[in-house]
Amino acid sequence: MTRKILVTSALPYANGSIHLGHMVEHIQTDVWVRFQKLRGNECHYCCADDTHGTPVMLAAQKQGIAPEDMIAKVREEHLADFTGFFIGYDNYYSTHSPENKQFSQDIYRALKANGKIESRVIEQLFDPEKQMFLPDRFVKGECPKCHAQDQYGDNCEVCGTTYSPTELINPYSAVSGAKPELRESEHFFFKLGECADFLKAWTSGNNPHDGKPHLQAEALNKMKEWLGEGEETTLSDWDISRDAPYFGFEIPDAPGKYFYVWLDAPVGYMASFKNLCDRIGVDFDEYFKADSQTEMYHFIGKDILYFHALFWPAMLHFSGHRAPTGVYAHGFLTVDGQKMSKSRGTFITAKSYLEQGLNPEWMRYYIAAKLNSKIEDIDLNLQDFISRVNSDLVGKYVNIAARASGFIAKRFEGRLKDVADSELLAKLTAQSEAIAECYESREYARALRDIMALADIVNEYVDANKPWELAKQEGQDARLHEVCSELINAFTMLTAYLAPVLPQTAANAAKFLNLEAITWANTRETLGKHAINKYEHLMQRVEQKQVDDLIEANKQSIQTTPAPAAEESQYEKVAEQASFDDFMKIDMRVAKVLNCEAVEGSTKLLKFDLDFGFEKRIIFSGIAASYPNPAELNGRMVIAVANFAPRKMAKFGVSEGMILSAATADGKLKLLDVDAGAQPGDKVG
């Protein structure tokens, strides 16, 4: 039975270039979609640019153009990059679209009618000159601890202290330079806490299509942390509004209030699909009605699991729509074992890769060969990239056709012999369903290992039968014809197995093989007495110089592109050396979060009630921007400095320690994880 499937990748933000980190997800999705289409399923792949928010608005102002003009230009650039890597969207749209506006407003109205929307008054810093509320990173001033100038409103880049924007000395707006004021504003909240029963059932449930879980095991464990145990829930309500000026969609019946980007961004999946449906005549409602029998899968990065596994399913369900069939998260990309770095030239943009003339299918293959169904980071080792592509694709796969096609063309008028009874081909066809299951379950690394093992068998057959020697021997024409026909058939089967990963090579191979297209049926069927065309070379080797030039090109882009000093490297400068004795003065301990909550009157601080094993303490931490739902941290193990001198936090109370976190390249703060088995009070060092 033909399956009906909607598939999406997370929407790239319209305020930056596409890099290889983005490509991991879109290649993973594209491989899965192409596999489904090869199997004959009706599969629609939709994506879009995520276009709303303060960063887009300010970036457009800086360029002196309208946000609409900027996002249109960025969308063209993004689509060109993805197309260059053969990402085969059925529709690549924009969240700034009439369909998205309508769906966002309709969903909001439905949630409100179901009692899931509530208005509350909150306090925020306000720029009186620009007449806008300021996110923490748009407030600067003097660090209250080390007195460094021009520090951001959430942490000091000189001494590393975290704080609230209200603690800055002589704060000013990074947008206008004006002194900000603390003002009240009415905001709208999605009552996510009331959705806990549904979310507990959905996150732990299985999809009706094949009985597999909606979420990966690692994701489900994280959901259990966020959702709490039993009838209790740790979910906090979600602020879904922002104040004007803001580039986005205005909330119905709330002048000057706009949907927060994370409300209308996932709705962009619906909008992109609706736009496609209207063009090709597909029934949109069949896919999104509450009792839909179709399948819907979201491929995302692990950093946005909260939105896709909790917020989005709840939005859909309580607005009268279906929830996703599956949400599949992947890890991050490192290069040569380290985070991508502009200074080292390993923050590689898709555009630079294409402009340097590297074959995009090399990268598609390498990334796919590293991907599995788990939420694991993958590493692009550049030397391994060269050797694996050259060995697998050129040495094992492409050479099979090159070694047999010439004899078929010259000696047998380009026509194959019927080799349906070949033992060699039987070994290849026997793996069809096993490899299909690997693709279906996103075990691409295993699929490609198995495919290359089959290629090894074929190459062993080449070496054992030596067609170049048969061609020189009298009376061996029939055997030569048989061997070369087996090899061309084997090449066809391998091409079908690799087609989801190498779509352009498969298309070029189809021309050589005189086939309309490669399908999954080619993994099980021989070609018979089929005429083929002249062989054209299908793939070149990767040269070391090409990779070296790529790295240099990305280093050069930093030197020639004006940017703030903070953008020169994604890593902060290493502090002065500390002696061993200095380090030993710091007493770091594991602590369990008993309760975490927002601090009334602060947009920056979270209050942690911690169990250190030997005693309980309260610590304030300036990480509210990174954890908008603080209750999700309840029950988590953290690392804290236990002998840090108590510090009075303005009017909020005394902080009895410091919780350790990592500052990411985009300014977010992430708590450090503790391995399973560690207990409160355990010493870290």
UniProtKB/Swiss-Prot annotation:
Q: Which domain of life is it from?
A: Bacteria
**Coordinates of motif 'KMSKS' region in the sequence?**
339-343
Does the keyword Cytoplasm feature in the UniProt annotation? yes
Return the GO cellular component terms, semicolon-separated: cytosol
Q: Which Pfam families match?
A: Anticodon_3, tRNA-synt_1g, tRNA_bind
Q: Name one GO molecular function term.
A: ATP binding
EC number from the UniProt entry: 6.1.1.10
Catalysed conversion reaction: tRNA(Met) + L-methionine + ATP = L-methionyl-tRNA(Met) + AMP + diphosphate
Residues that coordinate or bind Zn(2+): 143, 146, 156, 159
The reply to whether tRNA-binding figures as a keyword in the UniProt entry is yes
Subunit note: Homodimer.
Q: State what protein this is by name.
A: Methionine--tRNA ligase
Q: According to the entry, what is the taxonomic lineage of the organism?
A: Bacteria, Pseudomonadati, Pseudomonadota, Betaproteobacteria, Neisseriales
